[in-house]
């Protein structure tokens, strides 16, 4: 099962470059019997468009050839912790034992492992960091944010 994490899109619903890199990675990994779970709802920092981020992600993957039958319900999340919580709720409705391939961005993998490892404890997971292809300065800003977020989690734990 492929779980592709959401990221910012534009007010128009157009997906941003980080989302596209994650979705292209998902498409590259997709096989005929795969299931796909798209995450991302709405939030002031990543999606203020009419539809959920997951809606736009699914539409993108369908345009690239992923069939409707491959998609699970959306995890309409607000952040990475919420991605894991809502993913767990969806997985609880399915047959146990599937390998989860969690797709995020290269700079985000460490925090995703920390969060999903706690919330989805007991699931077999593989983590893929899609190459973000960002300018060095933008990449460094995101990496700095991730380091601070990880330190906060390690110091205070997760709240969910």
Which positions does each model-derived feature cover?
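A structural signal for short, hydrophobic/glycine-enriched beta-strand patches
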Residues: 1-144, 148
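A polyampholytic, Gly/Pro-enriched intrinsically disordered region
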Residues: 143-160
